[in-house]
Amino acid sequence: MAFDTHHVKKRNFSNSIDLPRKRISNFTSKNMKEVKRSPKQLAAYISRTVAQAVKSPEKLRKVLYHRKLVRRSFPNPCYKTKQSPKSGGCDMANKENELACAGHLPENLRHDSRTFVINTSDSGSSQTESPSSKYSGFFSEVSQDHETMAQVLFSRNLRLNVALTFWRKRSISELVAYLVRIEDLGVVVDCLPVLTNSLQEEKQYISLGCCVDLLPLVKSLLQSRFEEYVIVGLNWLQAVIKRWWSELSSTSEIISDGNIKILKQQLSGLWEQESHLTLVPGYTGNIAKDVDAYLLQLH
């Protein structure tokens, strides 16, 4: 009786132990079977599969990628299986698969693949192109006259500094002589508005002789194709006429200052050539009309 009890307990104890069972899915077993195929069988099988899928070239990459996944062996989650070392036969099978797939590719697909490689190299070369080479033509065009412009600006700055030195010393006669000597209309346009303001404020340090000496330069400004130059010249003429209008409009035959007679003659001759400025619309024409109204009274 005791023996039976002991036997029952032993049997129950053995039954209570739940030994883990090796679980292999259908997908894993199928893959393991495919791994056992010989290289020639595997190449023939893949060739048939690719021949069916090559009708739609877009699926070719998916087929190759799927076959690569199939060759993997998935280990069981419960047991540690010993992985077989990589053999040269498997690599040879891969090479045979690629050659077999390439042999079944249609002609247009092969041509497209070669074209894709060429386009890829072209796009790579365009992406690696440096900005300096891309805009080299633009930079060369911009910098074509850069040295000449730099020399002009340097010379202009130097001459303006000299004129500023004369102005600070209140040596107006030396300043006018310097402007007449260099004959640089750009410097004259920068300096003449300062003299115009002094004439409008009736400063005593600007003499009538200085204005007479500046008339040839003002004539060049009125004949310029730049409207800014013309406006500067007209403003100066207007300021000079208003500053010495009492002497210019005098009917006395005896003129105490000979420069008044010279100025009157030069103004009349100058305006005979530049009276067309009254036809210019806008601010320029308005100043020209005002100067013309003063000079008509002198005849």
UniProtKB/Swiss-Prot annotation:
GO terms for biological process: cytoplasmic microtubule organization; positive regulation of cytoskeleton organization. Its main location: nucleus. GO terms for molecular function: microtubule binding. It comes from the Eukaryota. Keywords: Cytoplasm, Cytoskeleton, Nucleus, Phosphoprotein. GO terms for cellular component: cleavage furrow; cytoplasm; katanin complex; midbody; mitotic spindle pole; nucleolus; nucleoplasm; nucleus. The modification Phosphoserine is found at S56. Disulfide bonds: none annotated. InterPro entries: Katanin_C-terminal, KATNBL1. Regulates microtubule-severing activity of KATNAL1 in a concentration-dependent manner in vitro. Interacts with KATNA1 and KATNAL1; these interactions are competed by KATNB1 which has a higher affinity for them. This is KATNB1-like protein 1.
